[in-house]
Amino acid sequence: VAENSKGNGGIFGWLARLTRQSQLDFFPVRHVLTDYDQSKLRSDVLAGVNVALLAFPQGMAYAMIAGLPVEYGLFGSAFALILGMLFSGAKFIVLGPTNATSVMLLSTFSTLGAMTLAQKAAVVPSLLIMVGLFLVVGAILRMASMIQFVSRTVVTGYIMAAAVLIMVNQVRNLVGFEFSPEDRAVSFVDVCRLTFFKLGEMPWGEWLTWYPIVLGGVTVGIFLLLQKRFAALPNVALTLVAGALLHWLATRISNSDLGVAMLSSPEAGGLSLNIPTFELEQMRMLIGAAVAMGLLCVLEGLSIGKLLAARQGRRLDANQEMFSMGMANLGCSVLSGMAASGSLTRSALNASSGAATQVSSLISGLLCLGGVFTIGQYISLVPKPCLAVMVMVIGYSLFSRKQYRIVTKTTLSDAVVFWVTFLTGLVFALDFAIYVGVGASIILYLRQAAAPHLVEYGFTEEGQLQELEARKRTDMEISIVHVEGELFFGAADLFLEQTRRFCADPNLKVVILKMRNARHMDATSCMALEELVRYMRQSEQHILVCEVKSDILQVMTKSGLRNLIGGDNLFEDVSTNPTMSAAKAVRRAREIVGTDKMKVSIYVDSFKQKKSREQEDKKSTK
């Protein structure tokens, strides 16, 4: 045993081989620093300052969305930027808290029951370390491509449900009330119910009740004006400063605090090492949210990263970026941060500001971190209603009419998946909505892929293909069946049923299956085809298989189907001569039938045949 362990390296040798096979670079920033010069530094400093001016107030807003102290959003923004720069292979993705992950945190806290601020903060490290491990392990196993199974329709439904929850959940911070510890606001429905109940208890006859609403309305007006006139400025930060000044003037004029809650400044000891607790029951409750949050991080980050990389003619290493997100979340788990994902707005701003390398993220992170310790004490001067309305504006910005139109008007399947995800996100916890949406999209896809439609075609006197009317064959015939699409387990029974239906004609003697466009044959489809062969032999009919590609042939060989069909009745595809395999099959069919006078019918997928005709018509009109 000792020799065996020594020979193969044991667990450490296996891990070393796995990391080599992952093709990850565990310190990619060294490639940037080797030829770093002054011109790149100037570009990175400019971009870094611009991103920091946006990331700082957004970090506060995302902390409020999640129901955490503001320092979690600020430290999360800073350390995600710094760690992301160290492990990212490109400059395109700027990491930090986002709307999607903040709402996921809020939803996770809600499912855990009544929690104080300290209890929520205690859960974050355990949750983030699970998210980070999920992303790191996924990157090592090169699983970034698996994200394609979460469709953009699911993400759109989730984002819009999250936007609604964000806006409704900020009503309490705007008006000035809190839910009791016994209230469980798990979903949008719960938040609406509790909010309406609390609004009914407010003393609307007193003018102080209306003051925070008026202050919030004026704050929104200032922001919209700044956005219209000075869109290039850091308007979120400027608006919060303006709101704080307005409230300060109002308190001086009225000589009272006006009963408005203020934000709390980051605590002096807010930055500390948080050691996650690994309790089995807590991990069981958090695992679903951790996986969903990990999927969201990769989806958000890779979406904006691939877009920005394509604009510059570059290619994004998805697994490397997934690894950087994982390391950022692991770092934030012990450094009082929030979940780190790829930010759409900050990534776009970084690119438009002319960032030369990922060093711009390092500069942004250091500026945010410095801002916490220099101007962090002044955060307590910002009224909660001002930040609440800015969060509402951010939530409203998530609605996209274009995306809504695309996912609801393009296909019925997309519309169903969108509404299922959206409504589930309103009624249940948001992480559950992602799983339901993914499940619905996969089920609808399988239904489409598992529903082949075979239509009989024949040649007219002019030599044109046309659909044949239902009739009895009068001569011995050969039927050529074009097998196209997926031959996985979901399609096997339907294919067998439809094939047996036309094989029931006693005048039919030979069926030729053309397998060139068949894909992903599995054990279930092999057993279905085996059943078809035995059924036809009992009816003294023959089945030939042609244009069999190497992967399909390998499956047939391993399953024993190749021997059952027989070497004389199976013809491999010849890539250099596409028609040779089918010609051999027709020649073999003539030998079986024993005459050259026979009527040949062809079966194809009606939808694909129609699509092919449409493409040919388009070519002929050009």
Question: Where in the sequence are the language-model features?
Answer:
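Cytosolic C-terminal regulatory domains/tails of membrane transporters and channels
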Residues: 1-28, 453-622
